[in-house]
Amino acid sequence: IMSGHTHWNQSFESNNVFHHIHGAICGAWWGGETSFDGAPLGYAVYEIKNDSISWYFQSAGKDRNHQMQLTYVDSIGSVVANVWNWDAKWKVELIADGKEMGEMTRYIGYSPVMADYYNSLPPGSPWMKPVLTAHLFKMSIDKNVKRVSVRVTDRFGRVYNESISIK
């Protein structure tokens, strides 16, 4: 099932039926470059070959491999990965200074990027409020780590990588 007209993205499977909720291409009401869940402006691409279907999220103006955003949240000493097309068959792993650290922990929360954006707006902008999302992952890292990479493997075996420098 594919649905839309929300301003956030969500994917889940229930009773053997896969449901895609696609965010509006305008993101958070044309109010910036993200949706309420922190996902970039973009759209879903479905590829059908014979009796198989696969899909990915295409961020507007970005390469096809742009499937996540990494943020270091100093207040909790953790790296947060927002993997906007995530579903339960994906794997999200962290590498700190070249060392494999294992799978990140999924949690429900607000995108750090969208929360910061909302907090920077003038009072009275309630329609830009971020929404809780379940496609966030976090892992605490040692305070001496300089570079972090996150490797995401989707349900089709495609691998995506993003890296950030810490301080």
Name what the model sees in each region.
Residues 66-167:
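Long, low-complexity serine/threonine/glycine- and acidic-rich segments characteristic of extracellular
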Residues 1-72, 91, 100-102, 118-120:
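Conserved beta-sheet core of the metallophosphoesterase superfamily
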